[in-house]
Amino acid sequence: MKFTLVATVLLTFSLSAFAVEYPVLTTASPDQVGFDSQKLHRLDGWIQNQIDAGYPSINLLVIKDNHIVLQKAWGYAKKYDGSTLLAHPIRATTNTMYDLASNTKMYATNFALQKLVYEGKIDVNDLVSKYIPGFKDMPGDKIKGKNKLRIIDILHHVAGFPADPQYPNKNVAGKLFSQSKSTTLEMIKKTPLEYQPGSKHIYSDVDYMILGFIIESITAIPLDRYVETTIYKPLGLKHTVFNPLMKGFTPPQIAATELHGNTRDGVIHFPNIRTNTLWGQVHDEKAWYSMGGVSGHAGLFSDTHDMAVLMQVMLNGGGYGNVKLFDDKTVAQFTRRSPEDATFGLGWRVNGNASMTPTFGVLASPQTYGHTGWTGTLTSIDPVNHMAIVILGNRPHSPVANPKVNPNVFVSGLLPAATYGWIVDQIYGSLK
């Protein structure tokens, strides 16, 4: 009896001795971790000038050596109602939640895939058809290749799919039109390839819509429930969700985006298009109309603190505190440069050549990786300098510059703040 008790105690102690305890974020002054505070402070005035010039809002957080050294909000979470400037606009705070747009691809879909790969539940060399029944070449397809498409081809964006089929817009999608999730999967299967897989690189939302469906096939639960219960909740994240208005959040907690729904100030029309100022609903058309707000390519909302924890997970090699999601080998596998394009890992954008300067600036290490989002979001993770930066913004919350010429260019998108690399360089330039 005594021997059994002693053995149990020793075994428990032995296991606890080998338990991984990852670094967690604490706060520190910039000077404590190698920044020149005076130089870093110059960024404050420059960003405020951009807000004064019309950029809606910017939330910025900087991590260095496991410490949060800068966290600040500028501007307004909501300043317009339609085309009307509010008499009392709602200021952005460091707790404001933002539509992450394509950063969803990394912090929902990639995090889920990295976890599933680590757990041995999926291999990136598996065929897509293993998880999506009916995903195959059709007799009338001009370009074949779906039968042999692997998950790694999807992650590298070399799978042959078009960049944006615009499924919810019948005027553009034609026979591929869909405004329901179940129909959308069938339309994706029918979407013709635009090029022979592996022959070129085209960044495609369809790729990550497919990956979202694959995750749901493996886990047998919706994508949002999987990431919210197995990733965000264990990490203690309270402001990272899909469809926030359905999960207890209110519009004033969230940054607004486009002024007139998805109409680009009245020049785009399709059935069921939103026309009110978007506030708490995902901006992305495919995510909202075709996927019910939850998709592998867009739909996630978060704030800078929660994003900081997720970036720290990557810097830590897969965990945070006593939570382990995946390991450092998985991180290395997913952030390794693609042979087809040095600026891509497995989904992650990588600082592989000068074309990434507008994203990562000129001072970040070549090993830096992250992603951008159409709404005005950037994440930059630098394992060499043990540093990470998140910029959250609501760039579409401004008028369209010239709707008839280019409906996708907003007034705020013409300002220097729309180029993340400049902000990133000011931060790196403040290092001693």
From Swiss-Prot:
Enzyme's top EC category: hydrolase
Membrane topology: Single-pass membrane protein
Keyword presence, Transmembrane: yes
Pfam family membership, one: Beta-lactamase
Compartmental location: Cell inner membrane
Cross-referenced InterPro entries: Beta-lactam-related (IPR001466), Beta-lactam/transpept-like (IPR012338), Diverse_Enzym_Activities (IPR050789), Pept_S12_YfeW/YbbE-like (IPR022849)
Record-listed E.C. numbers: 3.4.16.4
Family, per entry: Belongs to the peptidase S12 family. YfeW subfamily.
PANTHER family the UniProt entry points to: BETA-LACTAMASE-RELATED (PTHR43283), BETA-LACTAMASE-RELATED DOMAIN-CONTAINING PROTEIN (PTHR43283:SF11)
Protein name: Putative D-alanyl-D-alanine carboxypeptidase
